[in-house]
Amino acid sequence: MIFKVFYQENPDEVPVREKTKTLYIEAESEREVRQKLQGHTMNIEYIQPLEGAHLEYEKKNPDFKVLEI
């Protein structure tokens, strides 16, 4: 399953919506996503599972690239 992760690059700063970034990652569960990203310094705001029409919509985005970890 593909997950969309909303995050802030600097975990020491207060989250600001305008600085929120996203990445896409393949995993079996939200827990696995967190385990894969554990070594990265980021503040994870939300992990959203993508499937069906929502996944197809996201694939049309030119920035859609699944992170390989």
Curated annotation (Swiss-Prot):
InterPro entries: RpoY (IPR009907). It holds the Pfam family RpoY. Keywords: DNA-directed RNA polymerase, Nucleotidyltransferase, Transcription, Transferase. It is an enzyme of class 2 (transferase). The keyword Protein biosynthesis does not apply. It comes from the Bacteria. Coiled coil: none annotated. It catalyses: RNA(n) + a ribonucleoside 5'-triphosphate = RNA(n+1) + diphosphate. One of its GO terms (molecular function) is DNA binding. One of its GO terms (biological process) is DNA-templated transcription. Its EC number is 2.7.7.6. One of its GO terms (cellular component) is DNA-directed RNA polymerase complex. A non-essential component of RNA polymerase (RNAP). RNAP is composed of a core of 2 alpha, a beta and a beta' subunit. The core is associated with a delta subunit, and at least one of epsilon or omega. When a sigma factor is associated with the core the holoenzyme is formed, which can initiate transcription. Belongs to the RNA polymerase subunit epsilon family. HAMAP family: RNApol_bact_RpoY (MF_01553). This is DNA-directed RNA polymerase subunit epsilon.
